[in-house]
Every structure is written in C-alpha cells, then in structure tokens.
C-alpha cells in the first residue's frame, strides 16, 4: 500500500514496531527477544534478528515493504553545534569536520546528516548562524541493517539515531492540545 512504512525499535530485550499508513499510526506491537540477541545495544546476529522480525511481522499481520529503524546510540555519533550560515552543500561538505575527534575511520566510510534546530539572525533579519543537531554513522552499519531487514522482507528507507526518533515524537505530541 502506498505511503505505508513500518518503524522498528530494536532494544536490549524487546523489539517494538509501529505501522503507519499515510502518516497515520495504524498498529503497534512489541515482542520480547530471546536471551543474547542484543548485547550492549548491538545486534549479536543479524540473520537471527531478521528471522525474528519476519516471524513477528507474520504473527501480527504486518505487510512487508518500506521500513524505518532506530539506530542505537552506540552506533551513531551525535552532536549539537553552531555554525556560520551556509548552504546545504557547504554544510554537507563541512559536517565531517565537526566529528574529526570522534571518527575512527576515513570520512568517506560514514553517512553524515543534520537537522536545523534554530537560526540566529542579525539586526536586519539575515541568518547569521545555524544551530544544528548533527550525526554520523558508518555506512557499513546502515548496510548491515538494510540486509537484515531485506532478509525479513522489508526495504529500509529510513535509519535514524534514537535522539531523532524522540525529537520527532515530542514534536508530534506538541501539536496535540490537551
């Protein structure tokens, strides 16, 4: 079905999934993991996790297709930074330098992304600085998750750090008037 995506949060002892169609939540589920499937936030066996997710999807009648996954904090570098105003292209070029003290491999082995949290303007209203949430993760990490989800019958479309998932959730909740 168009506009359908299933989001997975793979924790230490449970996998949680939420199915969305057209941006609306349709179904949520959670299933306890067998012992030793995840250790220190990292999946021990991608093949075993793929089989677990495939079975979970089957048990809950989840249509296979587009998927999103929350990457554990142990696999993603994140920072809040302030930079001078610049274009998207300039930002993407400069992001690796924000992580120079943290990266353990060549910068071409990482995906980098950012979200603008706020802008600082001068007296004339021109953007002077950007306050950003920036992140980096190894390309091999994303490819491991892509292969795992493919084995389970899903097509990875979004991989995000847990901080972004929580930020998106709180942003959505702020739109609800209680």
Language-model segments: what does each one mean?
Residues 1-102, 143, 173-174:
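Non-catalytic, solvent-exposed interaction/assembly segments
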Residues 71-172:
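Active-site neighborhood for divalent-cation/phosphate handling
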Residues 176-178:
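Conserved small/polar residues in nucleotide/adenosyl-binding loops
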């Amino acid at each position: 079905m168009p506009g359908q995506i299933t989001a997975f949060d793979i924790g230490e002892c449970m996998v949680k999934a939420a199915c969305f169609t057209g941006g609306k939540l349709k179904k949520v589920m959670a299933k306890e993991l067998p012992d030793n499937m995840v250790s220190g936030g990292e999946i021990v066996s991608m093949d075993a996790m793929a089989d677990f997710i495939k079975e979970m999807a089957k048990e809950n009648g989840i249509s296979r297709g587009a998927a999103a996954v929350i990457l554990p904090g142990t696999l993603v570098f994140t920072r809040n930074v302030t930079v001078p105003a610049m274009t998207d292209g300039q930002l993407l070029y400069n992001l690796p330098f924000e992580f120079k003290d943290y990266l353990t491999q060549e910068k071409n082995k990482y995906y980098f992304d950012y979200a603008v949290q706020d802008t600082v303007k001068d007296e004339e209203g021109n953007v002077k600085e950007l306050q950003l949430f920036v992140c980096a993760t190894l390309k091999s990490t994303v490819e491991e998750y892509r292969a795992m989800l493919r084995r389970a019958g899903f097509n990875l479309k979004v991989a995000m750090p847990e901080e972004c998932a929580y930020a998106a959730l709180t942003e959505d909740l702020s739109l609800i008037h209680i």
